[in-house]
């Protein structure tokens, strides 16, 4: 099973995160399938590769809670096809 989750980067006390598609059994810092975005909580910046995110969501990838909140704020779920499952 594939999940969309955050992968920590940056230095001590200054974390930035990559949003990645990764196998559930992998570690947080493990090998990812594809990088699909970037999130900086300190500057409150996000970059999302929306076509790649939609591809993984259509294939059944499950976003984690934090990634789901980021995607909701960016209104990515509105771009899913109507027959795809909705995420709360």
Curated annotation (Swiss-Prot):
One GO CC term, this protein: chloroplast
Gene Ontology MF term list: structural constituent of ribosome
UniProt GO BP: mitochondrial translation
Pfam families: Ribosomal_S16
Primary localisation category: plastid
Taxonomy, superkingdom: Eukaryota
InterPro entries: Ribosomal_bS16, Ribosomal_bS16_CS, Ribosomal_bS16_dom_sf
Keyword Glycosyltransferase: no
Compartments (UniProt record): Plastid, Chloroplast
Transmembrane segments: none
UniProt KW keywords: Chloroplast, Plastid, Ribonucleoprotein, Ribosomal protein
PANTHER family per the UniProt record, alphabetical: 30S RIBOSOMAL PROTEIN S16, SMALL RIBOSOMAL SUBUNIT PROTEIN BS16M
HAMAP family documented for this protein: Ribosomal_bS16
Family statement: Belongs to the bacterial ribosomal protein bS16 family.
NCBIfam families in the record: S16
Name this polypeptide is given: Small ribosomal subunit protein bS16c
Source organism of this protein record: Atropa belladonna
């Amino acid at each position: 099973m594939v999940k969309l989750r955050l992968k920590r980067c940056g230095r001590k006390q200054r974390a930035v995160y990559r949003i990645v598609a990764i196998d559930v059994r992998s570690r947080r810092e493990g090998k990812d399938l594809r990088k699909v975005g970037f999130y900086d909580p300190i500057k409150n910046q996000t970059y999302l590769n929306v076509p790649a995110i939609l591809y993984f969501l259509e294939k059944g990838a499950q976003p984690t809670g934090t990634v789901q909140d980021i995607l909701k704020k960016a209104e990515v779920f509105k771009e899913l096809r109507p027959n795809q499952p909705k995420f709360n």
